[in-house]
């Protein structure tokens, strides 16, 4: 389960209000808050996914509903649900910043709190581009994801049961282990087989995970905190947004500010 950060403590109350308003359904509104440190309670490997598009929400992660859309100001992103919060509707800082401003957090970082955004549970295929594995399968830790995977394999028609891949990497920030694929002969065996020893805590440096710090927008290596240049993942959607026809951008912005003005004066 994701640890509570000072940011989550200060902003979590508003998100819990959304959770009490029926956000466990298939669509609705949530108070989205920014989160700047990748984690996964089910062992999804950050070096194999786009960590700038992750949802950290109160509901437990299940074997089917792992993808949600989040929309604000005419913009929409798809987010992987691979971790569980303790009440807040946190999303990756870059996703929050892009939805709120139209810019990546590495380009124009913005500080702020809970923002009302529209969400919907969507088919997992909508998050395929966020999975950096062959066949867009969910990358799981062979050593530390078996409880979750076993629960999904017990549901053979579930999305995860049909779309997973195991790696001999121990932690979600890919600091320990071997970057190699493992297999499991389920249900005959309950332990994966890997080319190297399963769970070997070798120092892994070839597959770093990056975080974007709140509110500075600096990109850092998750395992060490070392500041590095911004990665391409954080720029793609904001570039697409800015590439829209100027009149369309203007129309969307005008509508957004009109709605904000109405809310302020009502």
Positions of PLM-derived features:
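Mature exported/compartmentalized surface modules and terminal targeting/interaction regions
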Residues: 2-3, 12-60, 64-66, 77, ...
């Amino acid at each position: 389960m994701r640890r509570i950060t000072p940011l989550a403590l200060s902003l979590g109350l508003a998100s819990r209000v959304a959770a009490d308003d029926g956000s466990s359904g298939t669509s609705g509104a949530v108070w989205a808050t920014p989160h700047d440190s990748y984690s996964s309670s089910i062992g999804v490997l950050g070096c194999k996914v786009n960590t700038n598009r992750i949802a950290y929400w109160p509901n437990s992660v299940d074997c089917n509903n792992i993808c949600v859309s989040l929309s604000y100001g005419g913009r929409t992103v798809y987010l992987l649900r691979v971790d569980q919060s303790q009440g807040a509707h946190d999303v990756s800082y870059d996703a929050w910043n892009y939805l709120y401003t139209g810019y990546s957090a590495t380009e124009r970082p913005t500080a702020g709190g809970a923002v009302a955004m529209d969400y919907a549970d969507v088919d997992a295929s909508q998050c395929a581009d966020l999975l950096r594995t062959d066949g867009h399968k969910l990358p799981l830790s062979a050593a530390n994801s078996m409880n979750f995977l076993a629960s999904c394999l017990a549901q053979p028609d579930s999305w995860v049961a049909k779309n997973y891949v195991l790696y001999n990497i121990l932690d979600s920030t890919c600091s320990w282990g071997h970057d190699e694929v493992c297999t499991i002969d389920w249900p005959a065996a309950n332990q994966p087989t890997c080319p190297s020893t399963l769970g070997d805590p070798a120092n892994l440096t070839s597959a770093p995970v990056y975080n974007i710090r709140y509110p500075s927008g600096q990109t850092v290596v998750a395992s060490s905190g070392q500041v590095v240049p911004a990665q391409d993942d954080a720029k793609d959607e904001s570039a697409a947004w800015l590439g829209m026809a100027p009149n369309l951008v203007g129309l969307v912005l005008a509508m957004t500010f009109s709605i904000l003005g109405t809310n302020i004066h009502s």
